[in-house]
A protein has these predicted regions:
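Positively charged n-region of N-terminal signal peptides that target proteins for export
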Residues: 1-4
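Bacterial N-terminal signal peptides
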Residues: 6-15
Length: 365
């Protein structure tokens, strides 16, 4: 009997511990709708995407204003190189370790911060000032400034291209999308578009950009090779009206990861409009009603879920709401700053993006 027990023990030792299954979590930074605390309070809320988006925990963060109150969260991004998640507020940039869940550093920057982006290799951050004149290029490990790019465009939203060679910069006061070559910081532009650009997205091959514009219930398409606007799309069957935030009818746009559809936010009508991207053109195919006015939208990496800022989690295939984000008190959670992270045990191994980007190319599969 002793020999049998020893043999079983030895077999377990040499076999090792069975590998942990990859688990999908949604990280939600709050306050993620202006500085309103009624939509989830303050902190980093974690939801289990493999278990009907059930609330898991709340991680304490920083990001307080000069009066000691939680400041507006402006962006969220992940670096697997540093194993950290980054949260920008109007005043500062925070770096939190995803494994220890402790604040590594928080830095305030002159002229504030807005929605930043982390390079695919996780080593560099492009950080806009708060609706200001410039973007700062940072070392992701330390937050130290490496370079500054001045556009005078009302710096606002930032998106790294999937190959790491280009970064896309959107300013609130410009009809052009600025494109930066990361090798030498040279700048080009795509546009002009219908009006000042708001949220946008790109395909995986970085051939097309899809942009919201001020005063447009719809979107426009830009050719990133020629630098020209090539298509204008209006929402059919709906009229714009007063919106609670952002001042434009459509503030939120995303590509499905397979790049077959565009999903578009409609604030006044509390809806998402879906458009098919076909060889013969762009075709409006449906509308999904939401619980509130959407101000942002992204997708899960695998394309299974559409995730608007309203907290209504949508099955991307059936176009039905399948879950609603709720915190530990049962309160409805909303945020425009969310990102998916995959864990192998306690280790982060893959991250999504706050932007709903195309993933059909080899870089993002």
């Amino acid at each position: 009997m002793k020999k049998y027990c020893f043999a079983v023990l030895w077999t377990l030792l040499i076999a090792g511990t069975p590998p942990a299954a990859i688990h999908h979590y949604l990280y939600v930074a709050e306050p993620g709708v202006r500085n309103y605390l009624q939509y989830g309070g303050h902190g980093l809320l974690v939801f289990d995407m493999d278990n009907d988006f059930k609330f898991v925990k709340r991680i304490a963060t920083g990001g307080l204003d000069d009066k000691g109150q939680p400041s507006n969260v402006k962006g969220v991004a992940v670096s697997l190189f540093t194993h950290c998640i980054y949260i920008s507020t109007i005043q500062s940039l925070l770096c939190l370790d995803l494994e220890t869940e402790k604040l590594v550093w928080e830095k305030k920057f002159e002229n504030g911060c807005d929605r930043m982006s982390v390079s695919p290799d996780g080593k560099t951050i492009y950080l806009p000032s708060f609706e200001g004149d410039d973007w700062k290029v940072l070392d992701a490990r330390t937050g130290d400034v490496l370079h500054k790019i001045v556009t005078h465009s009302g710096s606002h939203n930032t998106l790294y291209g999937p190959d790491g060679k280009k970064v896309y910069l959107e300013g609130l006061h410009s009809n052009y999308l600025t494109v930066v070559q990361t090798s030498d910081y040279s700048v080009s532009r795509t546009g002009p578009f219908f009006n000042h650009i708001r949220p946008f997205t790109i395909d995986s091959r970085q051939e097309r950009c899809y942009v919201n514009c001020d005063s447009l219930l719809g979107f426009e398409v830009g050719d990133l090779h020629t630098g020209r606007m090539i298509n204008h799309v209006d929402v059919k069957g709906f009229q714009p009206g007063p919106v609670k935030r952002h001042g434009c009818p459509s503030h939120g746009i995303a590509l499905t990861p397979d790049e077959r559809e565009i999903w578009l936010a409609d604030g006044f009508n509390e809806a998402l409009h879906v458009f098919a991207l076909t060889a013969t053109g762009i075709r409006q195919t449906g509308t999904i009603k939401l619980s509130d006015q959407p101000g942002w939208i992204t997708f899960s990496i695998d394309g299974k879920y559409a995730m608007p800022s309203t907290g209504d989690m949508i099955d991307a295939k059936t176009k039905k709401v399948v879950a609603t984000l709720q915190d530990e008190t049962g309160a409805h959670v909303q945020s425009e700053k969310i990102v998916e992270i995959l864990f192998d045990g306690q280790k982060p191994v893959r991250a999504g993006d706050q932007f709903g980007i195309g993933r059909r190319g080899s870089f993002l599969k």
